[in-house]
């Protein structure tokens, strides 16, 4: 098991990726502990001075002008957790909840939230024990933070709700016992500090990003395999073509394709003097499309890393000046727009792959047997698999519609503009899974095409990917139950096995 010392506000993209894919044990740096102690003392001092501060000794939202007496301040914090835990829908995956806990701990450790060390320690104990609060996916509009999901995250600390441990759902009491925690009484400001923030939408967006990274990698490798299967030209990937345009993502994507399509290909040598002048766009324009996708992935990843390290609480505690200021950092518009960018980019990965799958089954374009099967007519081959790819690509076009352009006033018009970031981020998983299946179908077709080109071999990396697939899915000699083949190929993409056997240069620049 890996051990991780948190330096507040310094999480890297690679570290966030590691946390998403695997459990680690977390401890705080000395800087984080100092930050927390200083901030908590400021809140205590403000209360001692009798100052009126939103969320500490007032109501919330439209009830902000209601003064809460000292004897009810802890009750206030508990009640906000209970009342705001109003989510619905399926539960978030453990990997997403793990990221949420990490991001909340990171934010509190910056020292602008006014919570006590004992509270942060309790969150760390949940995380380290892999006791994950059960959090419904739906119920947040992405301002004032992800209130409902974060309330569900906090419920177990106050002895309510349920948790999941080793795949089993337990009540809060059982979960706290495993983590070594007693039910918690929240101090002034702590309930609000836990609920305010963009950690749910950011965690969901990061989860989508990491899945889309694997889709991007697979689309490059499988797209190159389709070039081999269709006996396409390598000339469009020439370094000079992309240098004169100057788009960085395009230059990188072309380099990746050249990396896969090396000079080792017998197929390429066999048709290098053929009469065909140009390939269809889905083969020829891969660097242009995938490069644009890569630029957007890198742009969105930068926004999400900054958000993961940011403080999105309200109000914020500035200890040096003894100020507590109400602002709007909880508004998740940056996350919503980043998620929208990723949705469009991922949808385009699938759209291009679907067009290549259509090309491969068309004997007039690919010069392969119709629907990639012998004895056509008796056998339907890949006919309906390609229809599935078309259905998924079309579904993604709807899912990719921007969520951030929508807003609906809430909380009696106090919160009159919201980001819809949580939905924007949540649908990325659906899009990414669709894209994995689309690429899987293309991969099955391209591998079948390579089999028809035998005894000629493709480039070394193409053959490595081919062998990876053939270990799970046999050559399609005649019609058989097709769905398990698609799932097997998609699993190789989603679980990272394809990425492990075929490495590519600079998939993502670290930010």
UniProtKB/Swiss-Prot annotation:
GO terms for biological process: L-histidine catabolic process to glutamate and formamide; L-histidine catabolic process to glutamate and formate. Contains an active site 4-methylidene-imidazol-5-one (MIO), which is formed autocatalytically by cyclization and dehydration of residues Ala-Ser-Gly. It is found in: Cytoplasm. Gene3D superfamilies: Fumarase/aspartase (Central domain) (1.20.200.10), Fumarase/aspartase (N-terminal domain) (1.10.275.10). It is an enzyme of class 4 (lyase). One of its GO terms (molecular function) is histidine ammonia-lyase activity. CDD domains: PAL-HAL (cd00332). One of its GO terms (cellular component) is cytoplasm. Keywords: Cytoplasm, Histidine metabolism, Lyase. InterPro entries: Aromatic_Lyase, Fumarase/histidase_N, HutH, L-Aspartase-like, Phe/His_NH3-lyase_AS. Belongs to the PAL/histidase family. This is Histidine ammonia-lyase.
């Amino acid at each position: 098991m890996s051990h991780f010392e948190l330096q507040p506000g310094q999480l890297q993209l690679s570290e966030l990726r590691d946390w998403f894919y695997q459990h680690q044990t977390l401890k705080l740096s000395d800087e984080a502990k100092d930050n927390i102690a200083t901030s908590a003392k400021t809140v205590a001092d403000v209360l001692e001075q009798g100052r009126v501060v939103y969320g500490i000794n007032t109501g919330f939202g439209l009830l902000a002008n209601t003064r809460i007496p000292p004897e009810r301040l802890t009750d206030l914090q508990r009640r906000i957790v209970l009342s705001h835990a109003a989510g619905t829908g399926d539960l978030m995956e453990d990997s997403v909840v793990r990221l949420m806990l990490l991001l909340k701990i990171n934010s509190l450790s910056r020292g602008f939230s006014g919570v006590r060390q004992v509270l942060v320690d309790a969150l760390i104990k949940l995380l380290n024990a892999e006791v994950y609060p059960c959090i419904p996916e739906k119920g947040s509009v992405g301002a004032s933070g992800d209130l409902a999901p974060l309330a569900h995250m906090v419920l177990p600390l106050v002895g309510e709700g349920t948790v999941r441990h080793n795949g089993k759902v337990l009540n809060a009491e059982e979960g706290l016992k495993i983590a070594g925690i007693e039910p918690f009484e929240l101090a002034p400001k702590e309930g609000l500090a836990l609920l305010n923030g963009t950690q749910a939408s950011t965690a969901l967006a990061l989860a989508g990003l990491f899945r889309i990274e694997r889709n991007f990698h697979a689309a490059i490798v499988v797209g190159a395999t389709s070039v081999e299967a269709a006996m396409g030209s390598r000339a469009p990937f020439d370094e000079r073509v992309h240098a004169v345009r100057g788009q960085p993502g395009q230059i990188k994507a072309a380099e990746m394709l050249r990396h896969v399509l090396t000079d080792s290909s017998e197929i390429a040598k066999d048709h290098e003097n053929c009469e065909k002048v140009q390939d269809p766009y889905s083969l020829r324009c891969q660097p242009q499309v995938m490069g644009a996708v890569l630029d957007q992935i890198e742009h969105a990843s930068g926004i999400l890393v900054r958000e993961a390290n940011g403080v999105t609480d309200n109000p914020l505690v500035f200890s040096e000046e003894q100020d507590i200021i109400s602002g709007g950092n909880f508004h998740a518009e940056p996350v919503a727009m980043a998620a929208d960018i990723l949705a469009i980019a991922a949808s385009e990965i699938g759209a291009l792959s679907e067009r290549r799958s259509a090309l491969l089954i068309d004997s007039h374009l690919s010069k392969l047997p119709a629907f990639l099967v012998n004895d056509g007519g008796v056998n339907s081959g890949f006919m309906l698999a390609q229809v599935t790819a078309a259905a998924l690509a079309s579904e993604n076009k709807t899912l990719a519609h921007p969520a951030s352009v929508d807003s609906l006033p809430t909380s009696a018009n106090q919160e009159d503009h919201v980001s819809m970031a949580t939905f924007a981020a949540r649908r990325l998983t659906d899009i990414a899974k669709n894209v994995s299946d689309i690429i899987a179908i293309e991969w099955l077709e391209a591998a079948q095409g390579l089999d028809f080109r035998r005894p000629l071999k493709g480039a070394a990396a193409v053959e490595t990917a081919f062998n990876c697939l053939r270990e799970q899915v046999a050559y399609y000699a005649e019609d058989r139950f097709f769905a398990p083949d698609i799932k097997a190929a998609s699993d190789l993409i989603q679980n990272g096995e394809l990425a492990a056997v075929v490495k590519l240069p600079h998939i993502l620049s670290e930010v």
